[in-house]
């Protein structure tokens, strides 16, 4: 794990240093291109550090979930907008299929829900080749009451999200390792596609904190489906539904 983390941190750091040196050497060249590359590398480094901090907070029991009003379609649209660039760059089609009748005015931690979906979509983009497809599907079901649940029965909903890809797939013997901390399928995959191996672990921990469940189905050379289900409470006096899903992203 330490070797993989060191490699992942070193890569964006090298990028930051290299482009900073180029910007200094080529004084007559507009620095925007180098600054953009430095910014991208800095963001990649920040993501790694944030993952490490999240794991540390969760394992120490110091991470608290917010309970605030949010719109589910805003969360999904933001994720797909951010993921769209990398998907298009890789020649991948990104499609969103959101049940038009599901409730979208919810109460919960929108930031952490967005983090879960973003991790799953980013992972799918990483392991799907040119000409492939990723489909984000959201459905709604009935949620059973939880201990100390203050949400009235008529406002309880179960949000189910599927992220399907036509990527490389995962062998059955590795499926049980995917959501474990500091575990990856194999080192060669890590080197080819990058990543610390913390993203799926964080997804599992966040979903469990939300009293939900997460699972995966996969077949080598066919693709994978990562899915999770969490109970949420709808906002009072709100009948807002996803009349139109976020626009499908075409390459």
What are these regions (language model features)?
Residues 1-25, 43:
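Primarily the dimerization/phosphotransfer
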Residues 40-48:
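Short alpha-helical segment of the dimerization/phosphotransfer core of two-component systems
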Residues 56-67:
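Helix-loop junction within the histidine kinase core
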Residues 66-71, 88, 93-104, 141:
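Conserved catalytic submotifs in the C-terminal HATPase_c
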Residues 78, 85, 89, 140-160, ...:
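Disordered, acidic interdomain junction associated with two-component signaling
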Residues 176-180:
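ATPase catalytic-site recognition across NTP-hydrolyzing enzymes
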Residues 211-217:
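Glycine-rich ATP-binding loops of the HATPase_c
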């Amino acid at each position: 794990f330490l070797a993989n983390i060191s490699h992942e941190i070193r890569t964006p750091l090298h990028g930051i240093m290299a482009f900073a040196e180029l910007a200094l050497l080529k004084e007559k060249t507009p620095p925007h291109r180098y600054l953009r590359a430095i910014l991208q590398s800095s963001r990649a480094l920040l993501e790694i550090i944030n993952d490490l901090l999240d794991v540390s907070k969760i394992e120490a029991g110091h991470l608290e979930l917010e309970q605030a009003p949010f719109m589910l379609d805003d969360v999904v649209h933001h994720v797909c907008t951010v993921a769209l660039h990398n998907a298009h760059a890789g020649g991948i089609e990104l499609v969103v299929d959101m049940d038009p009748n599901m409730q979208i005015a919810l109460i919960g931690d929108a930031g952490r829900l967005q983090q879960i979906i973003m991790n799953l979509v980013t992972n799918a983009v990483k392991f799907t080749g040119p000409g492939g497809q990723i489909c984000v599907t959201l459905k709604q079901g009935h949620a059973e009451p939880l201990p100390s649940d203050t949400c009235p029965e008529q406002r309880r909903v179960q949000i189910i999200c599927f992220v399907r890809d036509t990527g490389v797939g995962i062998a059955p013997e590795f499926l049980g390792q995917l959501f474990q901390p500091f575990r990856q399928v194999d080192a060669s995959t890590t080197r080819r596609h990058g990543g610390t191996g913390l993203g799926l672990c964080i997804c599992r921990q966040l979903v469990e904190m939300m009293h939900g469940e997460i699972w995966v189905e996969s077949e080598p050379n066919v693709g994978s489906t990562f899915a999770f289900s969490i109970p949420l409470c709808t906002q009072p006096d709100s009948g807002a539904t996803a009349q139109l899903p976020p626009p499908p992203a075409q390459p």
